[in-house]
Design a protein with these regions (language model features):
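Oxyanion-binding/catalytic loops of NTP- or PPi-dependent enzymes
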Residues: 2-108, 116-123, 127-128, 135-242
């Protein structure tokens, strides 16, 4: 979600925020006078690691603090939970989907993370990340954010999109729309202002995947014509290979 890096307080129209809920890092932004502004936290950081630590007592810890705790507490520090959104246990590949934290992956029930005697759904853990992003937005906006547009990979199926929407609702947000990441990228770079019918190629090298999408712009409306990629060629996979 490119754009100017926002600091200070802004009055966002309609109290709607845009969220890039990523596999490894996430961002929150608003639109000010037609320009996307990525909001920073109190320490000036625009990226929020998509990491949640669930201690045995107390509330979950999200972001940089959770990431720092990963080395000492890998079994209770949840990373790359986006990979499990909307997936059933029988869809999990034990060879490639083997995190350090314990997951329940038996049968055809939804994937869950087992910690401290309870099971956490991917939606619940993603909601913790979204709550942290909402808090960052609340610090930078005059009006409390109540609604959000959340991006998802173009290849996400209905179950994965519904899981993302549910995570937003668990975070206390009204999810106005789920949009494809390539479309969000094209909008952020102002390609919707092009006057002529245009086809655009968008490459997305993220923490979980490497994708190529072909978009067609016609009168300000984007349509995803085709998308192709490798769901096991993201930054996580490169790190694991190294």
């Amino acid at each position: 979600m490119p754009g100017r890096w926002g600091r200070g307080r802004f009055r966002a129209v309609g109290k709607i925020i845009g969220i890039d809920l990523g596999t490894t890092n996430s961002l929150v932004a608003i639109v000010e006078s037609g320009i996307p502004l990525v909001l920073a936290d109190g320490q000036g950081r625009r990226l929020t690691p998509s990491v949640v630590r669930v201690p045995s007592a107390g509330e979950p810890v999200v972001g940089w603090e959770a990431k720092r705790a990963r080395a000492a507490h890998p079994e209770t520090t949840i990373t790359s939970i986006k990979r499990f959104m909307g997936r059933r246990c029988d869809e999990v590949d034990s060879a490639t989907d083997s995190p350090a934290y314990p997951i329940r992956a038996n049968g055809s029930t939804p994937v869950a993370v087992s910690l401290h005697g309870r099971e956490w759904s991917p939606e619940e853990l993603s909601a913790e990340i979204l709550k942290a992003l909402r808090a960052i937005a609340a610090e930078g906006m005059i009006d409390r954010p109540e609604a959000a547009v959340i991006t998802v990979p173009a290849y996400f199926n209905d179950a994965q999109r519904n899981s993302t929407r549910k995570a937003g609702e668990l975070a206390g947000l009204r999810v106005e729309r789920i949009i494809n990441e390539p479309t969000a990228a094209a909008l952020a770079y102002g390609l919707n202002s092009l006057k002529e019918k245009t086809k655009v190629a968008v490459y997305d090298l993220g923490g979980g995947t490497f994708d190529l999408s072909i978009l067609e712009l016609n009168k300000g409306v984007f349509q995803v014509l085709a998308t192709c990629g490798n769901t096991r060629l993201g930054g996580d996979d490169i790190d694991r290979a190294l």
